[in-house]
Amino acid sequence: MPKGLRRYYGKGHLHFITFSCYRRLPLLKRARARDVFVKELAKLREELGFQLIGYVVMPEHVHLLISEPQRGAPSTVLQKVKLRVARKLRKRRKSAPAGQMRLPLKECGEPLGAFWQARFYDFNVYSEQKRIEKLNYMHANPMNRKLVKHPKDWPWSSWGFYTRVGKVLVQIDV
């Protein structure tokens, strides 16, 4: 593992995880793609037994704030969610109805070899102050990127759960 990418598991901390689409391409720019991600995340939450404290799905990256799962490690969650989402979204593109134009996963005329970047960033959240800091950071992300004017307008985050405003797409644990 490269220097500076150590992972600390087994301490009971929450994990603030960031991972990106391949080459930071906006492969999650469509609402349908973000919906697929959220559905798969909800399924894995149940299967692996981790607590989902917060999340935001952006067009080219994702932030999660999770506990360590009962089965596996946070890296197991990432491995499974990345695999499932990539398979579903690639399958969807291949199975477009006859007569409908299908755009391959490619950028600049070059075939796309991967859906996700191989690595991910994992920060141990060891205090309530850090938990709030990371939640505020992720919930502000769509506004900071000028995708929306207010977090309530970006349903692919846990902001609606904490404010009780808007739609909650996946159950949040507190």
Model regions: which residues?
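Short catalytic/metal-binding and nucleic-acid-binding patches
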Residues: 1-174
